[in-house]
Amino acid sequence: MSASDWLALKTTLELAALTTLVLLMLGTPLAWWLASTRSRMAVVIEAVVALPLVLPPTVLGFYMLVALGPNGLIGGLMESLGLPHLAFTFTGLVLASTLYSLPFMVQPLKDAFAAVGTRMTEAAATLRASTRDSFFSIVLPLSRRGLLTAITLTFAHTLGEFGVVLMVGGNIPGQTRVLSIALYDHAESMDYAGAGLLAGGLLAASFLMLLSVYALNRRYRVVHP
Protein backbone atom coordinates (compact mmCIF):
# COMPACT_ATOMS: atom_id res chain seq x y z
CA MET A 1 0.00 0.00 0.00
CA SER A 2 1.19 3.49 -0.86
CA ALA A 3 1.28 6.43 1.53
CA SER A 4 -1.91 7.79 -0.02
CA ASP A 5 -3.63 4.44 0.56
CA TRP A 6 -2.65 4.46 4.24
CA LEU A 7 -4.03 7.99 4.47
CA ALA A 8 -7.26 6.78 2.85
CA LEU A 9 -7.41 3.94 5.39
CA LYS A 10 -7.05 6.44 8.24
CA THR A 11 -9.84 8.60 6.79
CA THR A 12 -12.05 5.55 6.29
CA LEU A 13 -11.65 4.34 9.87
CA GLU A 14 -12.27 7.83 11.25
CA LEU A 15 -15.40 8.17 9.11
CA ALA A 16 -16.73 4.74 10.11
CA ALA A 17 -16.04 5.32 13.80
CA LEU A 18 -17.63 8.78 13.90
CA THR A 19 -20.63 7.69 11.84
CA THR A 20 -21.21 4.72 14.13
CA LEU A 21 -20.89 6.89 17.25
CA VAL A 22 -23.28 9.55 15.95
CA LEU A 23 -25.82 6.95 14.86
CA LEU A 24 -25.55 5.14 18.18
CA MET A 25 -26.53 8.34 19.97
CA LEU A 26 -29.26 9.33 17.52
CA GLY A 27 -30.50 5.91 16.43
CA THR A 28 -30.96 4.39 19.89
CA PRO A 29 -33.74 6.75 21.09
CA LEU A 30 -35.34 6.69 17.64
CA ALA A 31 -35.36 2.88 17.58
CA TRP A 32 -36.79 2.77 21.11
CA TRP A 33 -39.55 5.18 20.13
CA LEU A 34 -40.39 3.17 17.00
CA ALA A 35 -40.48 -0.07 19.00
CA SER A 36 -42.75 1.28 21.73
CA THR A 37 -44.97 3.92 20.13
CA ARG A 38 -48.47 3.47 18.78
CA SER A 39 -48.37 6.71 16.82
CA ARG A 40 -49.61 6.59 13.24
CA MET A 41 -46.54 8.60 12.26
CA ALA A 42 -44.34 5.62 13.12
CA VAL A 43 -45.03 4.04 9.73
CA VAL A 44 -43.95 7.21 7.94
CA ILE A 45 -40.79 7.52 10.05
CA GLU A 46 -39.92 3.86 9.44
CA ALA A 47 -40.29 4.38 5.69
CA VAL A 48 -38.02 7.43 5.79
CA VAL A 49 -35.43 5.55 7.86
CA ALA A 50 -35.45 2.61 5.42
CA LEU A 51 -35.29 4.82 2.31
CA PRO A 52 -31.47 4.61 1.94
CA LEU A 53 -31.82 0.83 1.53
CA VAL A 54 -33.64 1.21 -1.80
CA LEU A 55 -32.53 4.66 -2.95
CA PRO A 56 -29.52 4.79 -5.31
CA PRO A 57 -26.54 6.23 -3.42
CA THR A 58 -25.98 8.86 -6.11
CA VAL A 59 -29.52 10.18 -5.63
CA LEU A 60 -29.06 10.57 -1.90
CA GLY A 61 -25.57 11.96 -2.47
CA PHE A 62 -26.86 14.54 -4.95
CA TYR A 63 -29.50 15.88 -2.58
CA MET A 64 -27.01 15.94 0.29
CA LEU A 65 -24.51 17.80 -1.91
CA VAL A 66 -27.14 20.40 -2.81
CA ALA A 67 -28.22 20.79 0.83
CA LEU A 68 -24.65 21.14 2.11
CA GLY A 69 -23.45 23.42 -0.71
CA PRO A 70 -23.27 27.23 -0.53
CA ASN A 71 -26.75 27.65 -2.00
CA GLY A 72 -28.36 24.80 -0.10
CA LEU A 73 -30.47 24.82 3.03
CA ILE A 74 -27.71 23.75 5.40
CA GLY A 75 -24.75 25.23 3.55
CA GLY A 76 -26.52 28.55 3.03
CA LEU A 77 -27.37 28.73 6.73
CA MET A 78 -23.76 27.99 7.63
CA GLU A 79 -22.48 30.76 5.39
CA SER A 80 -25.05 33.23 6.73
CA LEU A 81 -23.55 32.57 10.17
CA GLY A 82 -20.07 33.25 8.85
CA LEU A 83 -19.12 29.58 8.68
CA PRO A 84 -17.95 27.63 5.60
CA HIS A 85 -20.38 25.32 3.83
CA LEU A 86 -19.98 21.58 4.34
CA ALA A 87 -19.79 20.27 0.77
CA PHE A 88 -16.51 18.46 0.05
CA THR A 89 -15.52 18.45 3.72
CA PHE A 90 -15.03 15.64 6.22
CA THR A 91 -17.83 17.01 8.40
CA GLY A 92 -20.21 16.93 5.45
CA LEU A 93 -19.06 13.39 4.76
CA VAL A 94 -19.97 12.34 8.31
CA LEU A 95 -23.44 13.90 7.95
CA ALA A 96 -24.04 12.14 4.63
CA SER A 97 -22.76 8.80 5.94
CA THR A 98 -24.94 9.15 9.03
CA LEU A 99 -28.03 9.53 6.88
CA TYR A 100 -27.01 6.76 4.48
CA SER A 101 -26.26 4.23 7.24
CA LEU A 102 -29.26 5.14 9.40
CA PRO A 103 -31.30 1.96 8.70
CA PHE A 104 -28.34 -0.28 9.58
CA MET A 105 -28.36 1.13 13.10
CA VAL A 106 -32.06 1.70 13.69
CA GLN A 107 -33.58 -1.51 12.32
CA PRO A 108 -31.59 -4.05 14.41
CA LEU A 109 -32.08 -1.92 17.53
CA LYS A 110 -35.80 -1.56 16.88
CA ASP A 111 -36.21 -5.33 16.47
CA ALA A 112 -34.19 -5.97 19.64
CA PHE A 113 -36.21 -3.47 21.67
CA ALA A 114 -39.48 -4.88 20.34
CA ALA A 115 -38.38 -8.39 21.36
CA VAL A 116 -37.84 -7.22 24.94
CA GLY A 117 -41.44 -6.00 25.10
CA THR A 118 -42.97 -3.76 27.73
CA ARG A 119 -43.87 -6.25 30.47
CA MET A 120 -40.66 -5.80 32.48
CA THR A 121 -40.54 -2.03 32.06
CA GLU A 122 -44.15 -1.80 33.21
CA ALA A 123 -43.27 -3.92 36.24
CA ALA A 124 -40.33 -1.62 36.95
CA ALA A 125 -42.63 1.38 36.69
CA THR A 126 -44.81 -0.06 39.46
CA LEU A 127 -41.68 0.00 41.63
CA ARG A 128 -41.29 3.70 40.81
CA ALA A 129 -38.39 3.21 38.42
CA SER A 130 -38.10 6.06 35.94
CA THR A 131 -38.32 5.44 32.20
CA ARG A 132 -34.64 6.31 31.90
CA ASP A 133 -33.63 3.86 34.63
CA SER A 134 -35.76 1.10 33.11
CA PHE A 135 -34.24 1.66 29.69
CA PHE A 136 -30.61 1.57 30.84
CA SER A 137 -30.98 -1.16 33.47
CA ILE A 138 -33.45 -3.47 31.72
CA VAL A 139 -33.95 -2.78 28.02
CA LEU A 140 -30.36 -2.14 26.92
CA PRO A 141 -28.81 -5.16 28.71
CA LEU A 142 -31.47 -7.44 27.21
CA SER A 143 -30.89 -5.92 23.77
CA ARG A 144 -27.11 -6.32 23.69
CA ARG A 145 -27.16 -8.74 20.76
CA GLY A 146 -29.15 -6.27 18.69
CA LEU A 147 -26.85 -3.47 19.82
CA LEU A 148 -23.76 -5.40 18.76
CA THR A 149 -25.34 -6.24 15.40
CA ALA A 150 -26.33 -2.62 14.80
CA ILE A 151 -22.86 -1.29 15.61
CA THR A 152 -21.12 -3.89 13.45
CA LEU A 153 -23.42 -3.46 10.45
CA THR A 154 -23.15 0.32 10.61
CA PHE A 155 -19.36 0.27 10.84
CA ALA A 156 -18.99 -2.33 8.07
CA HIS A 157 -21.44 -0.53 5.80
CA THR A 158 -19.60 2.77 6.22
CA LEU A 159 -16.29 1.10 5.34
CA GLY A 160 -17.59 0.28 1.87
CA GLU A 161 -19.49 3.46 1.02
CA PHE A 162 -18.69 4.86 -2.42
CA GLY A 163 -21.48 6.72 -4.21
CA VAL A 164 -22.54 8.99 -1.37
CA VAL A 165 -18.92 9.61 -0.36
CA LEU A 166 -17.88 10.55 -3.88
CA MET A 167 -20.87 12.84 -4.45
CA VAL A 168 -20.64 14.70 -1.14
CA GLY A 169 -16.93 14.55 -0.31
CA GLY A 170 -15.23 14.23 -3.66
CA ASN A 171 -11.74 12.78 -3.75
CA ILE A 172 -9.55 15.01 -1.56
CA PRO A 173 -6.53 13.14 -0.13
CA GLY A 174 -6.32 13.35 3.64
CA GLN A 175 -9.84 14.77 3.93
CA THR A 176 -12.48 12.88 1.99
CA ARG A 177 -10.60 10.20 0.02
CA VAL A 178 -11.59 6.86 1.53
CA LEU A 179 -10.55 3.30 0.67
CA SER A 180 -13.42 2.64 -1.74
CA ILE A 181 -12.43 5.70 -3.77
CA ALA A 182 -8.74 4.76 -3.59
CA LEU A 183 -9.71 1.32 -4.93
CA TYR A 184 -11.59 2.98 -7.81
CA ASP A 185 -8.58 5.17 -8.59
CA HIS A 186 -6.30 2.11 -8.76
CA ALA A 187 -8.72 0.27 -11.05
CA GLU A 188 -9.18 3.32 -13.29
CA SER A 189 -5.41 3.64 -13.71
CA MET A 190 -5.19 -0.10 -14.55
CA ASP A 191 -3.32 -0.83 -11.31
CA TYR A 192 -5.17 -4.06 -10.63
CA ALA A 193 -2.63 -5.25 -8.07
CA GLY A 194 -3.26 -2.19 -5.90
CA ALA A 195 -7.01 -2.41 -6.46
CA GLY A 196 -7.00 -6.10 -5.59
CA LEU A 197 -5.10 -5.47 -2.37
CA LEU A 198 -7.62 -2.86 -1.20
CA ALA A 199 -10.60 -4.92 -2.37
CA GLY A 200 -9.31 -8.00 -0.57
CA GLY A 201 -8.71 -6.01 2.59
CA LEU A 202 -12.23 -4.57 2.58
CA LEU A 203 -13.70 -8.00 1.86
CA ALA A 204 -11.74 -9.65 4.67
CA ALA A 205 -12.58 -6.91 7.18
CA SER A 206 -16.29 -7.03 6.39
CA PHE A 207 -16.37 -10.83 6.51
CA LEU A 208 -14.55 -11.00 9.85
CA MET A 209 -16.86 -8.43 11.43
CA LEU A 210 -19.98 -10.25 10.27
CA LEU A 211 -18.50 -13.61 11.27
CA SER A 212 -17.84 -12.33 14.79
CA VAL A 213 -21.43 -11.08 15.12
CA TYR A 214 -22.95 -14.38 13.97
CA ALA A 215 -20.57 -16.38 16.17
CA LEU A 216 -21.40 -14.31 19.26
CA ASN A 217 -25.13 -14.50 18.54
CA ARG A 218 -24.95 -18.28 18.11
CA ARG A 219 -22.96 -18.62 21.33
CA TYR A 220 -25.53 -16.50 23.16
CA ARG A 221 -28.37 -18.72 21.90
CA VAL A 222 -26.52 -21.80 23.17
CA VAL A 223 -25.85 -20.30 26.60
CA HIS A 224 -29.29 -18.66 26.87
CA PRO A 225 -31.66 -20.94 24.86
Predicted regions and their residues:
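Transmembrane-helix boundary motif in ABC transporter permease subunits
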Residues: 19-49, 62-64, 77, 112-114, ...
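C-terminal transmembrane helix and the adjacent membrane-cytosol boundary/short C-terminal tail
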Residues: 103, 110-121, 125-129, 137, ...
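Transmembrane alpha-helices
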Residues: 21, 104-109, 113, 117, ...
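Transmembrane alpha-helices and adjacent helix-loop boundaries
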Residues: 55-61
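Membrane-interfacial helix termini and adjacent extracytoplasmic/periplasmic loops
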Residues: 61-98, 168-172
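Interhelical loop and adjacent transmembrane-helix boundary motif
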Residues: 1-7, 168-207, 211
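Non-cytoplasmic
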Residues: 69-70, 146-185
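Transmembrane alpha-helix signature in integral membrane proteins
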Residues: 5-34, 53, 98
